[in-house]
Amino acid sequence: MGAKLTDSKAVPLDAMIDQIVDAHHHLWDLDKIQYPWLMARGVSRFFGDPTPIQQNYLASDFLDDIGDLPVTRSVHIQVGAAQPDTVTETLWLQSEAGRTSHGIPNAIVAFCDLTATDADKTLDAQAECENLRGIRQIVGRAPDTDAESATRLLLESPDWRKRLASLPSRHLSFDLQLIPEQLGAVADILAEIPDLKVALCHCGSPHDQSAAGLAFWRKGLTRLAELRNVFCKLSGFCMFEQNWDAERVRRTALTAIDIFGVNRCMFGSNFPVEKLYVSYQELYTTYLDLIDDFSGSEKDALIASNARCFYRLED
Protein backbone atom coordinates (compact mmCIF):
# COMPACT_ATOMS: atom_id res chain seq x y z
CA MET A 1 0.00 0.00 0.00
CA GLY A 2 1.32 3.46 -0.87
CA ALA A 3 1.96 6.23 1.59
CA LYS A 4 -0.82 8.74 2.17
CA LEU A 5 -0.41 12.39 1.39
CA THR A 6 -0.65 14.50 4.51
CA ASP A 7 -3.29 17.16 4.98
CA SER A 8 -1.72 20.56 4.35
CA LYS A 9 -4.14 22.21 6.77
CA ALA A 10 -3.78 19.66 9.58
CA VAL A 11 -1.19 21.37 11.79
CA PRO A 12 -1.41 25.09 12.67
CA LEU A 13 1.72 27.19 12.74
CA ASP A 14 2.06 28.59 16.26
CA ALA A 15 5.25 30.59 15.82
CA MET A 16 4.94 33.64 13.58
CA ILE A 17 7.74 35.01 11.41
CA ASP A 18 7.80 37.76 8.83
CA GLN A 19 8.79 35.72 5.78
CA ILE A 20 9.98 32.36 4.56
CA VAL A 21 12.21 31.61 1.60
CA ASP A 22 11.83 27.93 0.75
CA ALA A 23 15.32 26.99 -0.43
CA HIS A 24 14.44 23.61 -1.93
CA HIS A 25 11.26 22.37 -3.57
CA HIS A 26 10.02 20.74 -6.77
CA LEU A 27 7.20 21.13 -9.29
CA TRP A 28 6.23 18.93 -12.22
CA ASP A 29 3.75 18.63 -15.04
CA LEU A 30 3.51 15.03 -16.18
CA ASP A 31 1.49 16.05 -19.23
CA LYS A 32 4.26 18.25 -20.61
CA ILE A 33 7.54 16.77 -19.41
CA GLN A 34 8.86 13.23 -19.03
CA TYR A 35 10.15 12.25 -15.58
CA PRO A 36 11.22 8.58 -15.89
CA TRP A 37 11.85 8.04 -12.17
CA LEU A 38 8.48 9.51 -11.22
CA MET A 39 6.35 7.96 -13.95
CA ALA A 40 7.45 4.35 -13.41
CA ARG A 41 4.47 2.66 -11.75
CA GLY A 42 4.91 0.20 -8.91
CA VAL A 43 8.59 0.99 -8.40
CA SER A 44 9.72 1.85 -4.87
CA ARG A 45 12.39 4.52 -4.51
CA PHE A 46 15.01 5.15 -1.85
CA PHE A 47 12.74 7.80 -0.33
CA GLY A 48 9.73 5.46 -0.24
CA ASP A 49 6.66 4.73 -2.35
CA PRO A 50 6.11 7.58 -4.84
CA THR A 51 2.58 6.51 -5.80
CA PRO A 52 0.79 9.40 -4.03
CA ILE A 53 2.90 12.02 -5.83
CA GLN A 54 2.66 10.47 -9.29
CA GLN A 55 0.43 13.30 -10.43
CA ASN A 56 0.89 16.89 -11.54
CA TYR A 57 2.29 19.20 -8.89
CA LEU A 58 2.05 22.74 -10.22
CA ALA A 59 2.89 26.08 -8.64
CA SER A 60 -0.78 26.44 -7.70
CA ASP A 61 -0.62 23.12 -5.81
CA PHE A 62 2.52 24.24 -4.02
CA LEU A 63 0.85 27.50 -3.01
CA ASP A 64 -2.15 25.56 -1.74
CA ASP A 65 0.14 23.46 0.46
CA ILE A 66 1.84 26.61 1.74
CA GLY A 67 -1.53 27.96 2.85
CA ASP A 68 -1.24 31.05 5.03
CA LEU A 69 2.47 30.72 5.74
CA PRO A 70 4.47 33.81 4.69
CA VAL A 71 6.46 32.17 1.89
CA THR A 72 7.51 35.12 -0.25
CA ARG A 73 10.24 33.46 -2.33
CA SER A 74 11.13 29.91 -3.36
CA VAL A 75 13.91 27.99 -5.07
CA HIS A 76 13.03 25.22 -7.51
CA ILE A 77 15.49 22.36 -7.89
CA GLN A 78 15.60 20.22 -11.03
CA VAL A 79 13.78 16.98 -10.59
CA GLY A 80 15.03 14.41 -13.07
CA ALA A 81 13.37 15.34 -16.34
CA ALA A 82 14.35 13.13 -19.26
CA GLN A 83 17.38 14.46 -21.13
CA PRO A 84 15.49 15.99 -24.08
CA ASP A 85 13.22 17.79 -21.61
CA THR A 86 15.77 19.37 -19.27
CA VAL A 87 15.66 22.79 -20.93
CA THR A 88 11.91 22.42 -21.48
CA GLU A 89 11.55 21.92 -17.72
CA THR A 90 13.30 25.24 -17.06
CA LEU A 91 11.20 27.06 -19.65
CA TRP A 92 8.03 25.63 -18.12
CA LEU A 93 9.12 26.69 -14.63
CA GLN A 94 9.77 30.21 -15.88
CA SER A 95 6.24 30.30 -17.27
CA GLU A 96 4.85 29.04 -13.96
CA ALA A 97 6.67 31.86 -12.18
CA GLY A 98 4.91 34.35 -14.42
CA ARG A 99 1.53 33.10 -13.25
CA THR A 100 1.98 33.01 -9.47
CA SER A 101 1.99 35.44 -6.59
CA HIS A 102 5.50 36.67 -5.76
CA GLY A 103 6.73 35.02 -9.00
CA ILE A 104 7.20 31.60 -7.40
CA PRO A 105 9.50 29.85 -8.17
CA ASN A 106 11.76 32.90 -8.03
CA ALA A 107 14.98 30.95 -8.53
CA ILE A 108 15.53 27.93 -10.74
CA VAL A 109 18.34 25.42 -10.32
CA ALA A 110 18.37 23.51 -13.61
CA PHE A 111 19.97 20.31 -14.83
CA CYS A 112 22.95 20.01 -17.13
CA ASP A 113 25.07 16.96 -17.78
CA LEU A 114 28.44 18.58 -17.26
CA THR A 115 30.18 15.62 -18.91
CA ALA A 116 28.27 15.95 -22.19
CA THR A 117 29.99 17.29 -25.30
CA ASP A 118 27.13 19.77 -25.74
CA ALA A 119 27.11 20.90 -22.10
CA ASP A 120 28.05 24.49 -22.97
CA LYS A 121 25.19 24.65 -25.46
CA THR A 122 22.79 23.37 -22.80
CA LEU A 123 24.05 25.92 -20.28
CA ASP A 124 23.52 28.67 -22.86
CA ALA A 125 19.95 27.48 -23.45
CA GLN A 126 19.21 27.28 -19.72
CA ALA A 127 20.51 30.82 -19.29
CA GLU A 128 17.69 32.13 -21.50
CA CYS A 129 15.44 31.87 -18.43
CA GLU A 130 15.78 34.92 -16.21
CA ASN A 131 15.17 32.99 -12.99
CA LEU A 132 18.07 30.61 -13.58
CA ARG A 133 20.48 30.73 -10.65
CA GLY A 134 22.32 27.43 -10.62
CA ILE A 135 22.84 23.88 -11.81
CA ARG A 136 22.34 20.54 -10.12
CA GLN A 137 23.71 17.25 -11.37
CA ILE A 138 23.24 14.67 -8.65
CA VAL A 139 26.46 13.00 -7.53
CA GLY A 140 24.87 10.55 -5.08
CA ARG A 141 21.35 9.57 -3.98
CA ALA A 142 21.67 6.40 -1.88
CA PRO A 143 24.23 3.57 -1.86
CA ASP A 144 22.00 0.98 -3.54
CA THR A 145 20.66 3.44 -6.11
CA ASP A 146 24.11 4.77 -6.93
CA ALA A 147 25.45 1.25 -7.46
CA GLU A 148 23.04 0.91 -10.39
CA SER A 149 23.83 4.25 -12.00
CA ALA A 150 26.82 6.17 -13.32
CA THR A 151 26.45 9.16 -11.01
CA ARG A 152 29.19 7.87 -8.71
CA LEU A 153 31.62 8.15 -11.64
CA LEU A 154 31.11 11.90 -12.08
CA LEU A 155 33.78 12.77 -9.54
CA GLU A 156 36.36 10.95 -11.67
CA SER A 157 35.48 12.81 -14.87
CA PRO A 158 37.89 15.58 -16.00
CA ASP A 159 35.10 17.03 -18.15
CA TRP A 160 32.78 17.22 -15.15
CA ARG A 161 35.40 19.02 -13.08
CA LYS A 162 36.21 21.40 -15.93
CA ARG A 163 32.59 22.39 -16.51
CA LEU A 164 31.96 22.65 -12.78
CA ALA A 165 34.81 25.15 -12.59
CA SER A 166 33.24 27.15 -15.42
CA LEU A 167 29.96 27.84 -13.59
CA PRO A 168 31.17 30.94 -11.70
CA SER A 169 31.96 32.68 -15.00
CA ARG A 170 28.31 32.18 -15.87
CA HIS A 171 27.21 33.53 -12.47
CA LEU A 172 25.79 30.13 -11.58
CA SER A 173 25.96 28.21 -8.32
CA PHE A 174 25.96 24.43 -7.93
CA ASP A 175 23.52 22.37 -5.88
CA LEU A 176 25.39 19.36 -4.55
CA GLN A 177 23.49 16.19 -3.71
CA LEU A 178 25.61 13.29 -2.52
CA ILE A 179 26.01 10.76 0.27
CA PRO A 180 28.47 10.89 3.20
CA GLU A 181 30.82 8.42 1.52
CA GLN A 182 31.55 11.08 -1.11
CA LEU A 183 32.05 14.11 1.14
CA GLY A 184 35.82 13.83 1.35
CA ALA A 185 36.40 13.42 -2.38
CA VAL A 186 34.05 16.28 -3.19
CA ALA A 187 35.74 18.53 -0.65
CA ASP A 188 39.06 17.95 -2.42
CA ILE A 189 37.51 18.91 -5.77
CA LEU A 190 35.72 22.00 -4.47
CA ALA A 191 38.84 23.21 -2.70
CA GLU A 192 40.21 23.87 -6.19
CA ILE A 193 37.18 26.01 -7.15
CA PRO A 194 36.92 28.55 -4.30
CA ASP A 195 34.80 31.00 -6.32
CA LEU A 196 32.02 28.46 -6.96
CA LYS A 197 29.04 28.90 -4.64
CA VAL A 198 27.82 25.47 -3.55
CA ALA A 199 24.62 24.47 -1.76
CA LEU A 200 24.83 21.04 -0.13
CA CYS A 201 21.42 19.37 -0.45
CA HIS A 202 19.69 17.57 2.42
CA CYS A 203 22.50 17.98 4.98
CA GLY A 204 24.64 15.59 2.97
CA SER A 205 22.09 12.73 3.12
CA PRO A 206 23.01 10.94 6.38
CA HIS A 207 21.44 7.64 5.33
CA ASP A 208 23.15 5.58 8.05
CA GLN A 209 21.59 6.62 11.35
CA SER A 210 23.70 4.30 13.49
CA ALA A 211 26.18 5.87 15.90
CA ALA A 212 29.06 4.95 13.59
CA GLY A 213 27.20 6.20 10.53
CA LEU A 214 26.41 9.55 12.12
CA ALA A 215 30.00 9.97 13.31
CA PHE A 216 31.22 9.30 9.76
CA TRP A 217 28.70 11.83 8.40
CA ARG A 218 29.76 14.49 10.92
CA LYS A 219 33.42 14.00 10.02
CA GLY A 220 32.73 14.44 6.31
CA LEU A 221 30.44 17.39 6.91
CA THR A 222 33.12 19.08 9.01
CA ARG A 223 35.65 18.63 6.21
CA LEU A 224 33.29 20.15 3.64
CA ALA A 225 32.36 23.03 5.94
CA GLU A 226 36.01 24.14 5.98
CA LEU A 227 35.31 25.50 2.49
CA ARG A 228 33.69 28.88 3.06
CA ASN A 229 31.95 28.84 -0.32
CA VAL A 230 29.83 25.82 0.67
CA PHE A 231 26.42 26.28 2.31
CA CYS A 232 24.16 23.60 3.77
CA LYS A 233 20.46 23.02 3.07
CA LEU A 234 18.46 21.79 6.01
CA SER A 235 16.01 19.62 4.09
CA GLY A 236 15.16 16.10 2.97
CA PHE A 237 14.77 14.74 6.49
CA CYS A 238 12.46 11.91 5.37
CA MET A 239 14.59 10.74 2.46
CA PHE A 240 15.91 7.67 4.28
CA GLU A 241 13.88 7.14 7.46
CA GLN A 242 10.55 7.70 5.66
CA ASN A 243 8.73 9.26 8.57
CA TRP A 244 8.63 12.68 10.15
CA ASP A 245 10.46 12.41 13.47
CA ALA A 246 10.79 15.88 14.97
CA GLU A 247 13.60 14.80 17.29
CA ARG A 248 15.63 13.31 14.44
CA VAL A 249 15.04 16.46 12.39
CA ARG A 250 16.17 18.57 15.32
CA ARG A 251 19.31 16.51 15.92
CA THR A 252 20.32 16.49 12.26
CA ALA A 253 19.59 20.16 11.63
CA LEU A 254 21.30 21.42 14.78
CA THR A 255 24.37 19.31 14.02
CA ALA A 256 24.60 20.85 10.56
CA ILE A 257 24.08 24.35 11.95
CA ASP A 258 26.78 23.76 14.55
CA ILE A 259 29.22 22.64 11.84
CA PHE A 260 28.43 25.20 9.12
CA GLY A 261 27.28 28.08 11.30
CA VAL A 262 24.02 30.01 11.23
CA ASN A 263 25.08 32.16 8.29
CA ARG A 264 25.70 29.21 5.95
CA CYS A 265 22.56 27.14 6.48
CA MET A 266 19.06 27.46 5.02
CA PHE A 267 15.82 25.55 5.43
CA GLY A 268 13.98 23.96 2.52
CA SER A 269 10.80 21.90 2.34
CA ASN A 270 11.70 19.32 -0.32
CA PHE A 271 8.02 19.37 -1.24
CA PRO A 272 6.18 17.49 -2.62
CA VAL A 273 8.48 14.55 -1.84
CA GLU A 274 8.35 15.36 1.86
CA LYS A 275 4.57 15.64 1.57
CA LEU A 276 4.50 11.85 1.64
CA TYR A 277 5.18 12.11 5.37
CA VAL A 278 4.42 15.61 6.67
CA SER A 279 2.32 18.68 5.92
CA TYR A 280 3.96 21.97 5.00
CA GLN A 281 2.66 23.54 8.22
CA GLU A 282 4.02 20.80 10.46
CA LEU A 283 7.34 20.84 8.64
CA TYR A 284 7.90 24.55 9.22
CA THR A 285 6.52 24.36 12.75
CA THR A 286 9.22 21.78 13.49
CA TYR A 287 11.86 23.99 11.89
CA LEU A 288 10.82 27.00 13.95
CA ASP A 289 10.58 24.98 17.16
CA LEU A 290 14.13 23.68 16.83
CA ILE A 291 15.52 27.22 16.46
CA ASP A 292 13.22 28.72 19.10
CA ASP A 293 16.20 29.72 21.29
CA PHE A 294 17.99 31.48 18.43
CA SER A 295 17.98 35.26 18.10
CA GLY A 296 15.59 36.99 15.72
CA SER A 297 18.35 37.71 13.22
CA GLU A 298 19.57 34.10 13.36
CA LYS A 299 16.06 32.80 12.73
CA ASP A 300 15.68 35.13 9.76
CA ALA A 301 19.03 33.99 8.37
CA LEU A 302 18.06 30.32 8.49
CA ILE A 303 14.47 30.74 7.33
CA ALA A 304 14.87 33.46 4.72
CA SER A 305 17.87 35.75 4.28
CA ASN A 306 20.62 33.16 3.68
CA ALA A 307 18.67 31.61 0.82
CA ARG A 308 17.70 35.03 -0.50
CA CYS A 309 21.36 36.06 -0.62
CA PHE A 310 22.72 32.76 -1.96
CA TYR A 311 20.24 32.59 -4.84
CA ARG A 312 20.27 36.35 -5.51
CA LEU A 313 16.57 36.86 -4.85
CA GLU A 314 15.33 40.42 -5.09
CA ASP A 315 13.10 41.86 -2.37
Where are these regions (language model features)?
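Histidine-centered catalytic micro-motifs
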Residues: I20-L30, L200-C203
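Mid-to-C-terminal alpha-helical segments outside catalytic/metal-binding sites
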Residues: M1-A23, K32-D65, R73, T255, ...
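Conserved, mostly hydrophobic/aromatic
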Residues: H24, S74, I108, I135, ...
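Divalent metal-dependent hydrolysis catalytic cores, especially in the metallo-beta-lactamase
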Residues: G42-Q55, S60-A82, G103-D113, R133-G140, ...
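Catalytic pocket-lining loop regions of alpha/beta-barrel enzymes
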Residues: A150-M266
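Active-site gating/metal-coordination segments in enzymes
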Residues: G2-K9, P84-E181, F231-F240
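Acidic-and-aromatic substrate-binding clefts and catalytic sites of carbohydrate-active enzymes
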Residues: P52-I53, A81-V87, C112-D120, T145, ...
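Short, well-ordered coil/turn segments that N-cap beta-strands
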Residues: I17-Q19, L69-V75, S101-A107, C129-R133, ...
